[in-house]
Swiss-Prot record:
Segments crossing the lipid bilayer: none
Coiled coil regions, renumbered to chain: none
UniProt KW Manganese keyword: yes
Keywords attached to this entry: Arginine metabolism, Hydrolase, Manganese, Metal-binding
Subunit architecture: Homotrimer.
Name of this protein: Arginase
Species: Kluyveromyces lactis (strain ATCC 8585 / CBS 2359 / DSM 70799 / NBRC 1267 / NRRL Y-1140 / WM37)
Gene Ontology biological-process entries: arginine catabolic process to ornithine; urea cycle
Binding positions (substrate): 138-142, 149-151, 193, 256, 287
Cofactor: record remark: Binds 2 manganese ions per subunit.
Name of the encoding gene: CAR1
Length: 319
């Protein structure tokens, strides 16, 4: 491996790996094992081989969040497990905030995408002008009033923006209204609810679906997204990457796969381009679910891809 890209916001290449083995934002088991599989694949040593000094943060260690998924009283209206999600994401928030404020790049391994409530809020505490690239097949911007499933992994962006605040569960009222709609751009969308489409349009949020990738090419889409969330060209960048942005042909072991996604090469090129900006300050890799694989090869494909996303974002280059 070689590592050439610069990282302008860090005097030294120091990085905190935050493990977030949490599945309470959705009903399927197994996604809580994503971090363990990524680490077993050698991700930490891979990152260190790129010149990063790493520390390991485990904010959920010692807490039994999995048994809490069976608590049928943990509801608020249609919202499922808000107390569980609120507790877990607050711990993740404190951990990511600590890593960021110590001058380290935060790499958080999930876990379902509800953990981004904590990661994004933690990063924006340190870098309030950061632009957020949300790489996902889904918009994850349903509110407490629009969600049909009640699964909070489909709602993290709305909590971060403070949308529908009057209906926010008490356990999630700690979440700061920290995300400006002008500071987020989506790439890879292909499964968006009707209510979400309205939210995106009403808030003027930059949203690039697979149609835009096909029409303009991925490199142009990345450039357009960066111009939206970081118009000055020097702002920090955070990437929250749901592996289902990549087509299930390459990433089969994930909770809500949607055909017609990014190719594996496109999925890696995306973060390679972000690394080239020199402005990456945080990365999430979420929704790897080994239990949803139909055979061992699917586990290997998915976990290997998750590790590759992290390495490419952190500066791995071929030449």
């Amino acid at each position: 491996m070689s590592s050439d890209p610069r990282f302008d916001f860090f005097q030294q290449k120091k990085l905190g790996i935050v493990l977030a083995p949490f599945s309470g934002g959705q009903p399927k088991s197994g996604v809580e094992n994503g971090p363990k599989y990524l680490m077993k694949q050698g991700l930490r040593s891979d990152i260190e081989s790129l010149g990063w000094e790493t520390t390991l943060e485990e904010p959920l260690k010692g807490r039994d969040f999995e048994s809490g998924k069976n608590d049928e009283t943990d509801v608020y209206g249609i919202m499922k497990r808000p107390n569980l999600v609120g507790e877990a994401t607050k711990l993740i928030y404190e951990s990511v905030k600590k890593v960021s404020n110590e001058g380290r790049l935060a790499v958080t391994l999930g876990g379902d995408h509800s953990i981004a409530i904590g990661t994004v809020a933690g990063v924006l505490d340190k870098y309030p002008n950061a632009g957020l690239l949300w790489i996902d097949a889904h918009a994850d911007i349903n509110t407490c009033s629009t969600t049909e499933s009640g699964n909070i992994h489909g709602c993290p962006v709305s909590f971060l923006m403070g949308l529908d605040a009057k209906n926010t569960p008490p356990s999630l009222k700690w979440v700061p209204k920290c995300l400006d709609p002008k500071k987020i751009a989506y790439i890879g969308l292909r499964d968006v609810d009707a209510a979400e489409r309205k939210i995106l349009k009403d808030n003027g949020i930059a949203s690039y679906s697979m149609y835009h990738v096909d029409r303009y090419g991925l490199n142009k889409v990345i450039e357009m997204a960066l111009e939206k969330v970081a118009p000055n060209g020097d702002e920090p960048i955070m990437v929250s990457y749901d592996v289902d942005a990549i087509d299930p042909l390459y990433v089969p072991a994930t909770g809500t796969p949607v055909r017609g996604g990014l190719t594996l090469r496109e999925g890696l090129f995306l973060v390679e381009r972000i690394a080239e900006t020199g402005r990456l300050v945080a990365l999430d890799v979420v929704e790897c679910n080994p239990e949803l694989a139909s055979h061992d090869g699917h586990v290997v494909d998915t976990i290997t891809t998750g590790c590759s996303i992290a390495r490419c974002a952190l500066g791995e280059t071929l030449l």
